Amino acid sequence: MKIRIKVKQLVLFVLLPLALLIVIPGVLQQAAAPSVQPATSAAANTVSKAREELLNTLNSNSGSKRMTLIRTRIIEPGNARPPYQYNVYIGSSSSQWSQNNNEEPPSLLLPGDKLRFLKEYVLEGPIDRYLLTAAKQLAYEYDVLGTGSDGDKVLTEAIARISSKSSLARELLLLQAQRALSAGNWAAAKVLLMQADSPGHYGEEELNARSAWLSARLLFAEGDSSGALKLVSNGLESYQEVRDQKYQEMNEGNGGDSQDSQDSKDSKNFQGSTVSASPPESLKATSQFLEEPHSESERQLLLMRNALLSAAEAGNSAPATLSGTLTYSDGTPVSRAGIFLRPESEVSHSVLNGSEPYEIYTDAQGRFSFSGVIPGYYQLHLGLSFEQIDGWTWPVQTDDWIEIKPNDRLTNNIILQPLLELKSPVNSQILTGDSVEFEWEAVKNAASYSLSGTVSAEGSTFSYVIRQHITGNKISIPVTELYNSGGFSTSSSGEGWESVKPSSLLGFADPSGRFSWSIEVYDESGRVITRSNGYRLNEDTVGNLPFFYLQSRSLTAADQLVKAQKLEQALEAYRHDYAGDPQDDHALKMLVHLMTAKASYTKDKSLEAATIPLLVKLVELRPTADYVFNLAHYYYEQSDWKSYNHYYSWFLELREQKPHSYDQGINAIALMYQGELDEARSQFVASLEEDGSHRFIGSYLAAELAAGQPLDDVLKLAQRYPQHSPGSSTVNWAKLITLMKAERTGQPELFDRQLKQMLELYTARSGKLREWIGESGDSALKTFMKAVLEVG
């Protein structure tokens, strides 16, 4: 039995524990040390006094000593949290947080104070690297006040102080050029980039790469997409040539024994000749090392080149603009926040401070704007301090993609919502009854609520959705339903299936576990309005803690073995318990869980098959929607359509609500395999409309072609439902259909005949299709069919 991964539920599994873990440290810190929470009047007076003392110290000195004080008391502390570095990053696909307890304390000075002293250092201080740092901090202060033009004037004056041939002058020019690009001032950016590339700058590959990156952005913004692609490609090639040369020189300098000497010779020939079948290990490592970008400059060039190539393939040669505001729900603007417009290829990794292709701060009114954006699919991410997000949430969803088309002028306003308050069970309440009464704050305009639970035990957490589409703000859940929870997740201890975390297997059936819960609120369109889990960091926002203990049962001897992570012994103990009492549904459930976990790790097909009769018995004792769907999915994999249809129909009865988009997609494929093309196509549409990632679009396109739809119509569907799969290779189905159209023009009758044959093999689930794909020779049709086989 295969482990099913539903995209949206996977995200809940990954992100929900993260969010709760973020809340908990802050909550516990508040409980342990309330004195560090909201500033009292005495604390405010202390800060005010310290500010006055610092101002007096700065104002009472002059000359070099004054500049030294500005550097040590303002510029250097400002580096503790540089621009675009925040406590919390929130996005559609992921969230992250950090808190460095060793950070310098925040500046005592007000923004106006910092502006004055930073400007003085930039215009009168020593010409050193601290001048560049001060210039960046000064530009930031002007930007967040909404007076970026004043910052540009100061930068211009600073550049005039410095030799035009110095690297420092060039860095300042590139900084100013990037600011002009971000502001949409192409003319100013062009002049600044020309100045930055004036003769005399040699041996500065990092600055050369940055100049190429900015210049390519400018060319695209001006409408010269082909010129931008050529420039960034040349810049990348030049950068990599210098990089490779440095590695070759480094290897040559490592001379020693004969093996090192041979490594050096091979390394010198790495770029231009064929490497022998068994190269030295050091050369293998170097080869692998050079395949990946090894600096932010190289990564930015690669990213831009790929974005421009994708835009060119789609015929998108004109830039776009996206702007908006970031506010709280009461209308208060959120200033000094980071806004990151991240392309689809980049959203699977954490935000890279200061190196994202499109990043900007919100000004005093919460405004932000991106100009010269390359068309494509993007997601917005926010950078916030703990203070900014404390008690609030951004109700963003996994599939919140922004499609940016040529010449678009889009507006995307972001509104933070107050966190939902939980009522019961809370604050580590111990429950011993037959049900759990969940209750939470009612939310205006809420159409439904989703209840999720998290199991915390032995240093690990495991989360899942308990109930969806709840219409009121309270619900009673039988403990037996909670006991049905569980799956398995791994820990760092142990090897193979013995590394499965006990808490993930026992779930809510562990009376020693501490459990927590959360609520998400949805409107009538299925959009998230707000949620309960988030950042609560002080006594005004902490509210009730979402923890409780469920002690309605005691651990069995077999359970104790699971707790001790003696899983082989536990497996036999549960087998013995079930043999002694065929009505022992807990022993049977745990037996199925353990066997499934072991089969998954060992790839033992016979063990997998052996779980099915037990799962059949389990659904007789505990007929839950998830258990029944697991059976349906098993028979789907076996192409046993009679059994599949039986269990899928039963699943729909037990679910009592519309199925998840994943379930609909699987059922659509099953219907297609059974020759029910019309119903399959209808189910595909229902799945795709619910799933913003469009996971099953490839199968839907195959079904449409099998139904005799022309390639032109199928192309429109591919464009309507583009696949999104961050973190893995995304298939451009529209491109594949376009290539098939071009291939068909040569011999349309032959193409149509072969397409029909391959689709018949596909819908019959015939192994001959894979044999045909594995044959020599490439074609657009073969590429398409290969991609279709990978859907699911």
Where on the chain are the PLM-derived regions?
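A short, amphipathic beta-strand motif
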Residues: 320-328, 366, 414, 558
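Short, acidic Ser/Thr/Gly-rich low-complexity loop/linker segments typical of extracellular
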Residues: 347-367
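Short, ordered, surface-exposed loop/turn motifs in non-cytosolic proteins
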Residues: 189, 322, 328-349, 447
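A short, solvent-exposed beta-strand micro-motif common in secreted/extracellular proteins
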Residues: 366-367, 374-389
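Beta-strand-rich domain onsets/edges
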Residues: 287-321, 327-332
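Long, contiguous interaction/recruitment modules in multidomain scaffold/adaptor proteins
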Residues: 2-41, 413-559, 563-575, 579
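Alpha-helical repeat scaffolds
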Residues: 69-73, 111-122, 149-161, 187-198, ...
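Structured interaction patches on ligand/partner-binding surfaces of diverse proteins
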Residues: 237, 283-295, 385-411
